[in-house]
């Protein structure tokens, strides 16, 4: 896992340079997103003060969003628009990565999978904008 300050989100693909962006166009798991609050909960579940986010193998870390409540909703980060599609369940690798109980500590806190709807540059510090139901589709209609 490589940590970067900015990335290009490519519609229907993934993040430029990420292994998933090379696969089939329109893949169901283009990027993964986890919240800082989830990372803190995982650390607490393991009795730790801190866990390095890159250990969890998610593409983006955000804060202030209730990710699990945003199924099929749209968000904008930087210039890119994403649709959150499904919960991102932790894999069995988490027991070896985080230690015994790592997988169990992540249950319910794995974050979300998302599709990239509009390409754009994203970078650390970008505001995450929630696009309420209807607003993204309305914006598309205006642009056409």
Q: Whereabouts are the PLM-identified features?
A:
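Glycine-rich active-site loops that engage anionic ligands at enzyme catalytic sites
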Residues: 62-118
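Serine/threonine-rich low-complexity intrinsically disordered regions
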Residues: 52, 102, 108, 132-135
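Well-ordered alpha/beta subsegment
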Residues: 112-144
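Electropositive, beta-rich accessory/interaction domains or terminal extensions
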Residues: 1-77, 81, 86-87, 136-144
């Amino acid at each position: 896992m490589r940590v970067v300050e900015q990335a290009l989100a490519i519609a229907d693909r993934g993040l430029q340079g990420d292994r998933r962006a090379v696969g089939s166009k329109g893949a169901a798991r283009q990027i993964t997103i986890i919240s800082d609050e989830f990372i803190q909960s995982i650390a607490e579940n393991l009795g730790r003060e801190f866990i390095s986010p890159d250990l969890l193998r998610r593409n983006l870390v955000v804060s202030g969003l209730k990710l699990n409540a945003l199924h099929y909703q749209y968000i904008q980060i930087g210039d890119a628009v994403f649709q959150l599609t499904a919960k991102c369940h932790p894999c069995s690798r988490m027991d070896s990565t985080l230690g015994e109980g790592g997988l169990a500590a992540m249950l319910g806190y794995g974050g979300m999978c998302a599709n990239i709807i509009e390409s754009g540059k994203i970078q650390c510090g970008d505001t995450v904008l929630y696009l309420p139901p209807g607003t993204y589709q309305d914006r598309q209609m205006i642009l056409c």
